């Protein structure tokens, strides 16, 4: 092994990052051991220290391996560690780290941090040159003691208990973020995010679905929000992909700027106020991909059906629509208004290529069949129409007749229509 060229040894070591493998390489030969300091990436799996002996602790072993490196750039620690242990090894390698990923495991309240016993979040300050930070299982009820992370472009927090002010202070310390992900975060009520460089943002707030969100990010291109009842995003000139969902609560209001660049819109949830849905559909007139799965409307506790939607007006208002995925209530609303009997002969749906329709009920079967037939008739570029009936209520006497009509339509257009 000592006779291997340096370039070969360095290439082999560049493919190794598991801490157990790195430690084993120390035993291969003197040349390999001497090359250990040049390892750039280390990964400590969750169960790596399950069988420690002789009084060893995970903190000590992590410190031993980390301190043997020089200019470490990537560090991933999923195994258990203490704040004191974390402070010691970040003191050694923090200045060279570019990417840090930690499984914090501190969702429960612990002793209040102080100068002699800083919290795990406070310790991250030692890695001041970070470009990417990923944290799992975070307790952030107090603002972390961070200076500004000027180089940090990617921040991801998964599974967290947060307070509004603590999150606001943390984001104030990361002004140059381009990519922000907050998943499975609970405890938030009013969220204010102002990040002038932000382009990609994914927010998933766990709880009652009543969170209020205000986002100021003039460069935002991709935005995904789950769990908010009020959403305000005024600077949207660059926004191309937008997904809004609330699986637990009700969406009362949306306040967006012009969505002229929007290509994809997804609206999901149990209940949305109709004004919010209608406003999004009006703003998204240039959208190419529209996904709608909202079960009910209504401003208060009562769950109401969708009002009637004019088929012709809808497609005239969305001339660039290429992919349309429509579920139950919205499809029923699109069928109710009797606008298909006197359609202008020049009417066509110019860009529509793919449609997926979820049929939940056989009621108003004739209108629904007219709508399906109209999609085929007026969709001049239509390539695929998928009709999903797996969840259709079959107890009604007309269910079998309706299904036969759908099968007949498929038989006439077997290259175009599929039934799921």
Question: Which stretches of residues belong to each language-model region?
Answer:
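Leucine-rich repeat
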Residues: 3-11, 15-186, 192-194, ...
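Canonical position 11/12 of the leucine-rich repeat
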Residues: 140, 162, 187-188, 208, ...
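A generic structural motif
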Residues: 102-105, 292-296, 326, 385-392, ...
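Acidic, glycine-rich loop-and-beta core segments that form the ion-binding/anion-interacting portion
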Residues: 208-209, 213-268
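C-terminal effector modules
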Residues: 376-420
